[in-house]
């Protein structure tokens, strides 16, 4: 199927992907560079999505492309669960960059989903460590944390979390204080 046909057929994504994965930005990206994206008519946009994969590093970052290329040329597994020189270099640079006495460990993850689930676990463990009764988690309305069960429990999107039948009674949602709205 040609890209033009896919672009014209807005139902394409609905047909082949679940509702939660259908693109919510109605721009079919043709190319991207730095913090810009272009559609099929070469209209240029600033990419304010800050979403998965590029996460504020931009598209086609030459330094990143070179570094990834260098790593991929080495025929070893590049999982974050194995020791290797790239991991050691990265940890050293990251800790030096953060430069905080009490922030001297790294916890590698491969996605925002994994990070959200780990944060949920750490929040709960920290509360229980301080006091066995500290089970509650307060979340602000309008948040979006992902598509996993834990993430959707933290989010207050009722439409996307209605499938969850055993909601956590210790997760509370409060309105975000929008000071500009009266």
Positions of PLM-derived features:
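Glycine-rich loop-to-alpha-helix module at the N-terminal edge of alpha/beta enzyme cores
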Residues: 3, 17, 44-130
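Exposed alpha-helical structural elements
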Residues: 8-12, 63, 67, 159
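Active-site-adjacent loop/helix segments that line or gate small-molecule/cofactor pockets in enzymes
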Residues: 1-33, 50
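Short beta-strand-to-turn element immediately C-terminal to the catalytic PLP-Schiff-base lysine
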Residues: 38-39, 57-58, 151-156
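Conserved S/T- and glycine-rich ATP-binding loop of Class I adenylate-forming
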Residues: 1, 42, 137
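Glycine-rich, flexible loop/turn motifs
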Residues: 17-18, 23-25, 53, 72, ...
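PLP-dependent aspartate aminotransferase-fold enzymes
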Residues: 92-182
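Active-site-flanking structural segment that lines cofactor/substrate pockets
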Residues: 27-45, 55
């Amino acid at each position: 199927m040609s890209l033009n046909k896919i672009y014209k057929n807005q139902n394409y994504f609905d047909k082949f992907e679940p509702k939660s994965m259908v693109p919510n930005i109605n721009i079919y990206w043709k190319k991207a560079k730095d913090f810009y994206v272009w559609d099929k008519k070469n209209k240029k946009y600033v990419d304010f999505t800050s979403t998965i994969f590029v996460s504020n590093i931009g598209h086609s970052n030459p330094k990143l492309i070179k570094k990834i290329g260098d790593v991929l040329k080495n025929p070893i597994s590049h999982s974050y669960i194995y020791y290797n020189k790239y991991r050691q270099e990265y940890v050293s640079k990251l800790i030096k960059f953060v430069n905080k006495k009490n922030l001297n460990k790294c916890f590698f993850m491969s996605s925002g989903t994994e990070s959200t689930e780990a944060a949920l676990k750490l929040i709960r463990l920290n509360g229980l460590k301080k006091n066995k009764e500290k089970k509650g988690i307060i979340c602000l309305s309008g948040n979006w944390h992902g598509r996993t069960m834990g993430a959707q429990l933290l989010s207050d999107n009722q439409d996307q979390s209605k499938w969850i039948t055993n909601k956590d009674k210790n997760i509370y949602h409060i309105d975000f204080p929008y000071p500009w709205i009266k």
